[in-house]
């Protein structure tokens, strides 16, 4: 996962301040996985979590990925001296604030959803919690 086109090739590191204001509530599915701490999540981690989710659900139900890795992270090659500019873009990450919903699922029962999202959470570098839509 990475953007098709970006305005700039390299980006500043930046910091993750505050809590998520947008993307903090369930928008599509019945169950979700919500971040409880700030961290950068890579495209590979998101993909690994998605695979764990879909495998456990046995292709039943529907999955929504609510984060997208749009920040390039640059890296210098191994054993290269400091200086000579910034390294080339190596991977793509998504900045995740606390309270952000990462994944949403629907079409499965509560127990299956909880198990699937727990498996997905194990693939991510952040603490998360299971959230459920309250019936109105």
Curated annotation (Swiss-Prot):
The terms under GO molecular function for this entry are:
rRNA binding; structural constituent of ribosome; tRNA binding
Known CDD domains for this protein? Answer: Ribosomal_L16_L10e
Query: Which SUPFAM superfamilies does its entry note?
Result: Ribosomal protein L16p/L10e (SSF54686)
GO terms under cellular component: cytosolic large ribosomal subunit
The GO biological-process annotations, alphabetized, read as: translation
InterPro entries in the record, alphabetically?
Answer: Ribosomal_uL16, Ribosomal_uL16_bact-type, Ribosomal_uL16_CS, Ribosomal_uL16_dom, Ribosomal_uL16_sf
UniProtKB keywords: Ribonucleoprotein, Ribosomal protein, RNA-binding, rRNA-binding, tRNA-binding
Subunit record text:
Part of the 50S ribosomal subunit.
**Reported function:** Binds 23S rRNA and is also seen to make contacts with the A and possibly P site tRNAs.
**Family designation:** Belongs to the universal ribosomal protein uL16 family.
- Give the protein's recorded name: Large ribosomal subunit protein uL16
Q: Which organism does this sequence originate in?
A: Bradyrhizobium diazoefficiens (strain JCM 10833 / BCRC 13528 / IAM 13628 / NBRC 14792 / USDA 110)
This protein's gene is called: rplP
């Amino acid at each position: 996962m990475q953007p098709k086109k970006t305005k700039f090739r390299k980006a500043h590191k930046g910091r993750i301040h505050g809590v998520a204001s947008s993307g903090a509530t369930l928008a599509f599915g019945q169950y979700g996985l919500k971040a409880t701490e700030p961290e950068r999540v890579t495209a590979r981690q998101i993909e690994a979590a998605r695979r764990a989710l879909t495998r456990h659900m046995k292709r039943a139900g529907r999955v929504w990925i609510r984060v997208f890795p749009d920040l390039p992270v640059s890296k210098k090659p191994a054993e290269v001296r400091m200086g000579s500019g910034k390294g080339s873009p190596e991977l793509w990450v998504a900045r995740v604030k606390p309270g952000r919903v990462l994944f949403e699922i629907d079409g499965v029962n509560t127990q299956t959803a909880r198990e699937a999202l727990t498996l997905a959470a194990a693939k991510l570098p952040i603490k998360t919690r299971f959230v459920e839509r309250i019936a109105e």
